[in-house]
């Protein structure tokens, strides 16, 4: 790469860093937390956690059918 290309990349990077540093994450995170997708993910996570807790407390479920005896 030549010097001009590197200089352009440097300036673009500095502009991006400046924009990121001036960005307020609090309002962004609040919007993300209240989004429909986040609500669906949280409800799915809660359901999976409840299922896991029930499996741990109740032990593994018994198999529905016992293995059949082998014929000789």
From Swiss-Prot:
Instruction: Provide the primary localization.
Output: secreted
| Summary of the tissues where the protein is detected | Expressed by the venom gland.
Name the Gene Ontology molecular function terms of this record. peptidase inhibitor activity; toxin activity
Q: Which UniProt keywords apply?
A: Cleavage on pair of basic residues, Hypotensive agent, Metalloenzyme inhibitor, Metalloprotease inhibitor, Protease inhibitor, Secreted, Signal, Toxin
| Cell compartment(s), UniProt | Secreted
* Keyword flag Signal: yes
| Extent of the signal sequence | 1-22
Proregion positions: 70-72
Biological process according to GO: regulation of blood pressure
This protein's GO cellular component annotations are: extracellular region
Q: Does the keyword NADP apply?
A: no
Q: What does this protein do?
A: Amphipathic peptide that shows bradykinin potentiating activity and antimicrobial activities against bacteria and fungi. Has higher antibacterial activities against Gram-negative than against Gram-positive bacteria. Also inhibits NADPH oxidase-dependent superoxide production (IC(50) is 0.4 uM on granulocytes stimulated with PMA, IC(50) is 0.51 uM on HL-60 cells undifferentiated and IC(50) is 0.53 uM on HL-60 cells treated with DMSO). The C-terminal peptide shows a higher bradykinin potentiating activity than the complete peptide.
Q: Its family?
A: Belongs to the non-disulfide-bridged peptide (NDBP) superfamily. Long chain multifunctional peptide (group 2) family.
What's this protein's name?
A: Bradykinin-potentiating peptide NDBP6
Organism (species):
Lychas mucronatus (Chinese swimming scorpion)
